């Protein structure tokens, strides 16, 4: 369980995240949606302390996320970003093995985990493991990025616009892959997106951010049926395609 309690982030006189409180249940997907500058990415990054809050507390399974050093916390939380963030001079297998290696896993355990994840993502380990990121398609790079984020078996996976750079067909496949992987591993996922349709499709609950404030946090059906503000209603109405509940 992730408990966010009164989290605020200010830069000088600018409040980027303003007194946000929410609870994310274990083994669920929470999507955070909002326009550019709404504070959604800053909120996400305060969970793994890439950004330190000005005030408030974030608890992971009851423990304050400041109770361990930041680098140690980040090794226990998966993190996937738009554009995959792969190391260009490391092979696919080496990229996926990054965090398990830092955690001191033995070679056989690392290989087994890399092979498992590559197979789950329909990437043959023998064929794709030795390749470099530039030898992959955009969709394949994205899959490797998520596999790397999951490699150390984290209970929590943070995703910042992970599918934003993909074309619509590949993006749909990536979303379905994520739902299947989440169901298999039971990972708690927090995913930031600017796309309300994606938020509805993937999220067990949706957090809508506007100007640093959490304006609604509810299940997709409730967001669609009873938007809490004109801003939420505008986001719901902005999609040109039907929502899939």
Each model region followed by its residue ranges:
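Conserved ABC ATPase signature
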Residues: 131-136, 140
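ABC ATPase NBD coupling module
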Residues: 65-78, 102, 226-227
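Helix-to-loop junction immediately C-terminal to a conserved catalytic motif
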Residues: 48
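ABC ATPase "signature
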Residues: 217-218, 226
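Conserved catalytic motifs of ABC-family nucleotide-binding domains
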Residues: 153
